[in-house]
């Protein structure tokens, strides 16, 4: 973090992050007000992302909502539907899988906006509807670092609870000072059998609990 006005810390590379801001926080009268806003959380890029600063971990955190993710066929109403939902006093959008065989969901974040030295966890936040089907085969989840190193695992959604939000962990990582700068890619993939009834809220990136 960067020290502002004595002992108050704000997030690493905050200026670059705030370029995507939906509301101009620089119009606020003081850094303390700015600090309050970033610790509470602020929306970026037309409410497709949310940034907040974790005071305890002194770490930047992000939620990449479904509109910020690359979801194959998501613009085709035969396969996906976009539903409004309320969160943090704002109307956002969640993607609902109607019927698809080719499940491909990808999120990206630049290492430059994450806090160095923090052990992060990335996880997709999803829900299975009561009528969900086609999830007998596990989904492949993958985390790919800028240097090309990968973490890969399989997650069985068949036994997950219905009608509640839950997290699919993609992996853990840490940004070291001097490490390769670039994109980290997170994905859920499953190209077998027809699937339906998955709601995708987004991808959360925050300190490992």
From Swiss-Prot:
Homodimer; non-covalently linked. The keyword ATP-binding does not apply. InterPro entries: PP2-like (IPR025886), PP2-like/Lectin (IPR052147). It comes from Luffa acutangula. GO terms for molecular function: carbohydrate binding. The record marks 102 as: Important for carbohydrate binding. Binds chito-oligosaccherides. Has hemagglutinating activity towards rabbit erythrocytes. This is Lectin. Keywords: Hemagglutinin, Lectin. The keyword RNA-binding does not apply.
